[in-house]
Amino acid sequence: MAYHKLDKKKYAAEQKEKLDELHARITEIGEGFNLSPETLADYYSFAGRFYQYSPRNNMLIYDQNKHATFCGSYKYYQDQGYSVKAGEHGLKILVPVTTTLFKVSENEWKKVSEATKEEKEKLKRKEFETRMVQNYKIGSVFDISQTTIPPEEYPKFYSVGYKSEQHATIFEGVKNYCENELNCPVKMANLHSIGLQGHYLPFENKIELNEILEDSKKLEIALHEMGHAIMHSDVFKELPREQIEFEADSIGLMFSSHFGFDFAETQKFHLAQQYRAMKEGNEEAVENNKKEPFDVNKILNNVSETYFEHIEKLSDYVNVSLLKDKVSTCLL
């Protein structure tokens, strides 16, 4: 179908309006966490499953379908030999698009795709200054439940969690990751307390876990303390205590979600409590001209991006640990 120049302008204006709406919705979601921090735990549980998407797209998918478990494009499912069911509507996301521009005059740049025949010849001869810019367009993805993939094959596409009897083996993978990748030893110790389950020692870059912990709790606490080691080994003195705890809670919950943990109400309460304390501390600092105003999206993005940087390699360590355990069990 051919489009007239006026149609193209109209289409571009409509697309920009839709993009602006998505960007505004992302901001609204972040502001919603300000009003109800308890919902953050549900978001982190969700985001822990979607490390292949950017934090902003995670928010958009979460906003449109909080029960999504695995998403892919229409083409992705086709490439796997399946299809999206008829009548299903996609979930809108932001898709990065790189555009090459060339300099026409001092104050004017033009898309290479819109170059005239003469300009294309000059471009071949490299007579124009060029640069690349990144913009976004609207794309669609579909949850696996919207496709023809049978439920029994879902585990081929995403992890459905681990059995509790595997937690000790998963812990060994987490421990090896901390020690080999973060240079952070993980030790079981007598902490002379029943209530203290573990702590991160920033000046030694070391994790100590209470030796009385059973396997599942030991793994859960290790993931939280690993969050400190990842996010705070260099900035422990610079950040408020409430922010340090909130960030460790946040990334720890994302790791826990990835490994199949359900969140206890006490964890959700603690996360919301730390969030409110962090926000109140920031408001006080702003009043005293010591800080910039609090930006929830900035903190959420930092936590999510840090999680994305580590989860694949951490999963590799865990899988190696599980494989070793399986081999040793077969040899018995």
Regions of interest found by a model, annotated:
Residues 1-332:
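N-terminal accessory/interface modules of nucleic-acid-binding and processing proteins
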